């Protein structure tokens, strides 16, 4: 991992705007996976892959042109930073009703305006309905190939790739199968471990996306006392650390946030309570 020794290196969280062509590919895939009998052939598989590869090449080139040192693929192939795992792991199906954060619940007028503006995501959030295991490594292999090819062409200082934490997958995709939430988290960690290790083995920095450690407070664990949230968040970190046990610390970084949505955020867990937990990762 490059360090800011001579100057402050520039980077970002990972997800970048998609073109309409990319959006069309992602939602065509979404429709096909939701209903195998649906006519979701807006793009043939080869064409869709070519669209994504071209988008990755362009977004990496653009980042380098703008002076970004540590670039990403913009998550071009992912419809969501957390639900993308349903394409790669077994055990997910259906959809999950949206539940706004506690801060928005207390401002129903704002919540209604956000809904009217189309701020609510339209993609599915599958639920865990069966055993979690690796299903298909093809999407990850394609992501790694596309990013490495783009990096060879644009020559940034370094590149990173996003991967969801076990906790954030559990936050957006509830458990209907495992006996306990802890069993679910453990299964997710075991299945995601190979993705984490493959990214690092490809010579790319791994970024763990873990908003569950902050946003989880006013969403999944909204009804829990703060002390109980801290205990649960600590368990999320233990599970994550186990999944990362073979990854050198200098090859991984972590993204934690309270949710990138327009809202009052008055239920955000305070940094002074959060930081001691996060530093255990």
Q: What are these model-predicted stretches?
A:
Residues 1-281:
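Domain-level signal for soluble alpha/beta catalytic cores
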């Amino acid at each position: 991992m490059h360090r800011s020794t001579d100057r402050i290196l520039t980077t970002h969280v990972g997800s970048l705007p998609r073109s309409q062509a990319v959006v069309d590919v992602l939602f065509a895939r979404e429709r096909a996976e939701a209903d195998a009998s649906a006519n979701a052939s807006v793009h043939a598989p080869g064409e869709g892959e070519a669209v994504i590869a071209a988008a990755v090449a362009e977004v990496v080139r653009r980042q380098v042109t703008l002076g970004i040192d540590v670039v990403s693929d913009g998550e071009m192939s992912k419809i969501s930073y957390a639900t993308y795992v349903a394409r790669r792991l077994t055990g997910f199906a259906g959809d999950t009703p949206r539940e706004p954060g506690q801060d928005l619940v207390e401002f129903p007028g704002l919540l209604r305006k956000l809904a009217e503006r189309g701020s609510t995501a339209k993609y599915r959030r599958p639920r865990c309905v069966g055993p979690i295991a690796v299903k298909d490594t093809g999407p990850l292999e394609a992501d790694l190939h596309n990013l490495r090819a783009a990096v060879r062409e644009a020559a940034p200082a370094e590149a990173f790739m996003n991967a969801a934490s076990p906790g954030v997958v559990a936050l957006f995709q509830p458990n209907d199968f495992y006996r306990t939430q802890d069993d679910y988290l453990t299964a997710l960690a075991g299945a995601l471990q190979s993705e984490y290790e493959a990214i690092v083995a490809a010579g790319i920095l791994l970024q763990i996306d873990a908003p569950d450690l902050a946003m989880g407070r006013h969403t999944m664990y909204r009804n829990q006392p703060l002390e109980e949230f801290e205990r649960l968040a600590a368990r999320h970190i233990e599970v994550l650390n186990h999944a990362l046990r073979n990854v050198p610390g200098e090859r991984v970084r972590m993204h934690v946030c309270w949710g990138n949505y327009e809202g009052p955020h008055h239920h955000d867990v305070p940094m002074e309570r959060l930081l001691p937990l996060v530093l255990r990762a």
